[in-house]
Design a protein with these regions (language model features):
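Transition segment at domain starts
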Residues: 20-62, 146-152
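Structural beta-strand segments of beta-rich domains
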Residues: 63-69
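Positively charged n-region of N-terminal signal peptides that target proteins for export
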Residues: 1-4
Length: 152
């Protein structure tokens, strides 16, 4: 009897997983700026990146360099979506980094959108890129993270 109650209690206490994360590393091989990739979490897929090496914006000393990610929600639920990209040279140094995501609300089931990931300040060696990492983060729309209890 005690085993049944402890199993039931564990089942009730365990919260459902509402968020997902997937990270993949790729070699740098864009063709005309576009590279096909596949990063998937909760049936949400980043399927391509279009890299734009950009220009330096004077007098800000910033760059217009960016990547545009195509994201498809092939699932049955709406998700809040975030995409992060870190680009590395042959020595493992980061030469560009940025993140982007859903502009307003969520990516509905069956929808496709593009997210712009800007590289405004870390961009000067982007031409030396050899590899990059893409992280896709998904969270079911309407799910709330439970706050951690304050320690006393």
């Amino acid at each position: 009897m005690v085993k049944r109650f402890s199993f039931l209690a564990a089942l009730l206490v365990a919260s459902p997983l509402f968020a997902g994360v997937a990270t993949e590393k790729f070699d740098w091989h864009p063709v005309n700026g576009v590279q096909e990739i596949h990063v998937e979490s909760d049936r949400v897929v980043v399927s391509s990146l279009e890299f734009d090496m950009g220009d330096r914006l004077k007098p800000l000393q910033a760059s217009s360099a960016k990547a545009v990610a195509r994201v498809d929600n092939n699932g049955f639920l709406a998700y809040e979506v975030g995409v992060a990209i870190a680009v590395f040279d042959g020595d493992g140094n980061i030469v560009a980094a940025g993140s982007g995501g859903v502009k307003l609300g969520s990516l509905g089931k069956g929808e496709r959108d593009t997210f712009t990931i800007r590289f405004p300040y870390v961009y000067r060696s982007l031409t030396n890129a050899k590899t990059f990492i893409v992280t896709l983060e998904t969270r079911e729309r309407g799910s709330k993270s439970k706050p951690k209890p304050a320690s006393q």
